[in-house]
């Protein structure tokens, strides 16, 4: 798991340099900013396998029967950078993050992941995130335990066909993209 966290940070830095420019990301500039993430990991920059395993267990226990996803923050540096354990039981809407890259490591389970393409009927979830009804285009990848996934900013991503028996658990890292002259 320690090597997973290091690879996670390196690939996220690479995502910041390779973000795609789309017009979908420009439509949410006047929408209210999302509230701060919840959890008790504020300014928590180190973790270990035992703590991550504990967070996975808590996440699987707190998910409600009608809920598609539950998450527990593991690492955080202020409000801008955070890593969370997510337990996904069923698909959530396809998304685009306009101001951050996202990195996933599949801890357990499997699903299909659609990357790229265009959101159909996009709406603003908040000032930097769009959701849609479906994805037009994009490439489908089957992901399983041990898969590393890099999602640059402005890239559509959508987990579907999630394992119905065990769901899918991922470690998810969000890193805001710097302004072009700050990298």
Locate the predicted segments by residue:
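Ligand-binding loop in jelly-roll beta-barrel domains
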Residues: 142-147, 153-177
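His/acidic/aromatic-lined binding-pocket segments of jelly-roll/cupin-type domains
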Residues: 95, 102-105, 140-141, 148-149
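Short, conserved beta-strand element in jelly-roll/cupin
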Residues: 98-113, 117-119, 127-134
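Short acidic-glycine-tyrosine-enriched beta hairpin
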Residues: 125-153
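N-terminal signal peptide c-region/cleavage motif recognized by signal peptidases
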Residues: 12-14
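Short histidine-centered beta-strand/loop micro-motifs
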Residues: 92-98, 160-162
């Amino acid at each position: 798991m320690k090597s997973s966290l290091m690879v996670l940070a390196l690939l996220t830095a690479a995502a910041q340099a390779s973000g795609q420019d789309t017009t979908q990301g420009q439509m949410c500039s006047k929408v209210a900013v999302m509230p701060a993430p919840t959890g008790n990991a504020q300014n928590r920059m180190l973790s270990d396998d035992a703590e991550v395993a504990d967070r996975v267990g808590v996440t699987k226990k707190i998910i409600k029967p009608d809920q598609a996803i539950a998450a527990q923050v593991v690492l955080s540096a202020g409000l801008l950078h955070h890593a969370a354990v997510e337990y996904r039981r069923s698909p959530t809407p396809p998304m685009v993050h306009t101001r951050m890259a996202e990195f996933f490591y599949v801890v357990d389970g499997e699903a299909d992941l659609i990357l790229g393409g265009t959101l159909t009927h996009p709406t603003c979830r908040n000032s930097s995130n769009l959701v849609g009804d479906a994805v037009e285009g994009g490439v489908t990848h089957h992901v399983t335990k041990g898969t590393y996934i890099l999602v640059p900013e402005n890239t559509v991503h959508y987990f579907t066909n999630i394992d119905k028996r065990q769901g899918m658990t991922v470690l998810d890292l969000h890193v805001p993209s710097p302004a072009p002259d700050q990298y």
